[in-house]
Amino acid sequence: MSLDRKINRIQFLSGNSLKVIAVLTMLIDHLCKIVLQWLLSNYWGAMADNGQMSWERFREIDYFIRFDLQSIGTIAFPLFCFLLAEGFQHTRSKKRYIGLMLAFALISEVPFDIGFFSAYSRMEDTFPFYLKYQNVFFTLFLGLLTLVCLERFSCKSDLPVDRIKSAVLQVLSVVLFSGIAEGIHCDYGMQGILFISAFYICRNHRIYQVLLFLLAYMGATGNQPPLCTLLAGLLILLYNGKRGKLKLKYFFYVFYPAHILALYLIQVGLGNRSHNGFLPQCWKKVLH
């Protein structure tokens, strides 16, 4: 029995299952970055300074948030890239798919900017806009354009010269859109283009998809894949090729800007309550 057939026997995760896992792990990551790191910077450090909390305890919390919790969030992006490549193959209208991605990239930009970069945009007097970094939908949009080129330049001839020409054009497409993603500072940048391309190029062999994805990770970062990135690869191996019963087609599109805005409002609410002395008293009880 071939390796692909052995893997097929243990696949049980639908596309909806992967999407839910990706959304939950992304939520954990963004909760850390928007709310918990803000508390770390604005309150827990001050509490350690004035003796309300030990520095050892502060460092434990800092490590837990920045490394343990946020590492869970690294599972999300490879799953979204994989689902994008899958969606590209099965969509009825590629133009509509690309247009939808661009529309939500524009819709999500203000929530993304105020959620992650409000302090910087206020310093630069550009609030609520922060033009130096773009949300992940722009990365996915560029990824779709890359897939259009990969499909357009795929070789349908057995002639060596045609195969070489096709390969060169495909590589140049990946390089071009990777450069654009880096140039406009999209979230994940070149990594996103490489991941999406890897999942599409090896679309007929799941094990090769995951292996090329891991190679793309090492090529983009220069590092060995961490545990949670390997876990993302394992989850992709367990994908059964089915969409699932629930209709979650547009859920992520809406959830992405909505949850960032909600987390930012929580951050603002915590800041307002701090003026009444609520936070120092509350966290003193929690952290001791």
Predicted regions and their residues:
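Alpha-helical transmembrane segments and their immediate juxtamembrane cytosolic regions
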Residues: M1-H288
